[in-house]
Regions:
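Active-site-adjacent substrate/metal-binding segments within catalytic domains
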Residues: 1-63, 69-94, 219-230
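Short, solvent-exposed loop/turn and secondary-structure capping segments
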Residues: 9, 42-43, 106-108, 196-198
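Short, charged/polar micro-motifs that form catalytic or ligand-binding hotspots
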Residues: 33, 118, 176
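Active-site-proximal loop/turn and secondary-structure-junction residues that shape catalytic pockets
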Residues: 36-38, 60-62, 101, 147, ...
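Active-site neighborhood of glycoside hydrolase catalytic domains
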Residues: 49-51, 64-156
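Active-site flanking residues adjacent to catalytic metal/cofactor-binding acidic residues
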Residues: 56, 99, 187
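Substrate-binding clefts and catalytic carboxylate motifs of secreted carbohydrate-active enzymes
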Residues: 95, 130-133, 145, 149-156, ...
Length: 231
């Protein structure tokens, strides 16, 4: 996920420190999430230098797309441009088609017509593999995250492929719930924390606003009261 939502505030120095922190914490893989953007060249140079492998999503996430002729022409060129730009990096471990779209299309979330299911398969199981065959046949391709290998074959199966498990956060389940599973590869899970006091000071004037139940704190909580209660 981008280290800054205001991309102009990003810097090579800040990103290097974050990646160095990852290495020191014994991370070995960095995932570039499909809901963000393709990083600059120096991001991959730093990963090369530090020995961090990169899981690279293509920039598609949490949606469905209508594969019109104009859109297909556009994304084909986007794929080719970024594949050619990044394929030489030793840190590039795999290409991934999208974030969470196979799972949700399989569940018919966001889907309003059958052609969107067809277009999903065309984009991630035909077009991208064909382009990779021509321009980077050596790098592994994974159709989605999570996935069990594609074609809507139980894409969030805990025993195959990779899994996104958010039932502790979104489902209000207790932390010991994690101990019930032995995921083959858990590529997403987590729980929100509150920001540090230094950050809170930037958007509060009255100490009364520091209360987590205050109006100001609730408005800065993306999930409003329900997420505040979980934390």
């Amino acid at each position: 996920i981008p280290e800054e939502h205001l991309l102009g505030r990003r810097s090579e120095e800040k990103t290097r420190q974050l990646l160095l922190d990852c290495k020191r914490a014994n991370f070995n893989v960095i995932r570039v999430w499909g809901g963000g953007f393709y990083p600059d060249e120096w991001f991959y140079d730093i990963c090369d230098e530090l020995g961090l492998a990169v899981w690279q999503d293509f920039m598609f996430a949490c949606s469905v797309y209508e594969l019109t002729e104009a859109f297909e022409t556009n994304i084909r060129q986007e794929f080719i441009d970024n594949i050619k730009r990044l394929r030489h990096h030793p840190s590039l471990a795999l290409w991934c088609g999208n974030n969470e779209m196979e799972m949700f299309v399989d569940e018919r979330c966001w889907v309003t017509k059958h052609t969107e299911v067809r277009d999903y398969l065309l984009m991630y199981e035909r077009i991208i593999p064909e382009i990779l065959k021509d321009h980077d046949h050596q790098t592994f391709y994974w159709p989605a995250s999570p996935s069990s290998g594609g074609s809507f074959d139980e894409p969030n199966d805990p025993a195959r492929g990779d899994v996104h498990y958010w039932k502790v956060w979104h489902g209000n389940r207790p932390f010991p719930e994690y101990r019930k599973f032995f995921f083959r590869y858990l590529s997403e899970f987590g729980f929100q924390s509150f920001p540090c006091k230094k950050t809170i000071d930037t958007f509060t004037d009255d100490p009364a606003d520091w209360n987590i139940f205050s109006y100001v704190m609730e408005k800065h909580q993306i999930g409003r009261a329900s997420c505040r209660e979980r934390v």
